[in-house]
Amino acid sequence: LYRFPVVFPTDRWQSVMPHELATWGAQDKRFWSEYSTDGRWRHCMTHAPVPVDATGRRTVRLFGGRKAIPREDNGGLCQPESCPEYQQRQCNLTGRFLFFIPGIRSISAFELHTRSFYAMNAAIRTFETVAFLRGGRLAGFLDRQGTPFYLTKRLMEVAHIDDQGRPVRVPQWIIELE
C-alpha cells in the first residue's frame, strides 16, 4: 500500500502517534522518554528501586508494577545530544501511528510502526497545524463530506551524519501524513 485513508480516534497527537526514545537492558527498558502534558518537554524516566520490607531481606510486592521516576543523573530531562546512551546508539527512537481505516470494521485501532525521525517530526507539524485550524480537533473526518487524512509513503533523500562526522544523503521511504 502506498496510500490509504485514515481517521484518528482522539484529538491529542501524543495519543495517536505515541513515540519514545528508549534504552533496553537484557530484560526490560532501562531508560525511556515521556512527554510533558503539553507535548513540549521530553523527560528521561527509569524504574524506581524496588522497596524492601522492614527486615531488609524481602522485596515488597508492588501493585500495578514498578513505578517510573525521572532519571537522577541527568535531572530528568531527555537531551539526546548530551546522553551517553544515545551517543553510543543504545537509545533509539520508536513510534507508531494509531488509526482507523474508514470502511473497515474494527474494535481496536490499526498500528503502523516507524523509527523515522523525519516521519514523526513532519506528522507532529501536520497534527499541530490541523488542530489549530480545526479548533483543536484531530479525531474523525476532516469535514462534513467525510474527508479523511491519508497515510502515504514517499521515497525521499534524507540527510544523516556518518561515522566520520560528514553529512550524507541517502534515499529512504518515509511515512507521510496528508
Show where each model-derived region lies.
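Extended serine/threonine-enriched, polar tracts that run as long, contiguous segments within proteins
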Residues: 84-178
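OB-fold ssDNA-binding interfaces and closely related basic DNA-contact patches used
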Residues: 1-105, 162-172
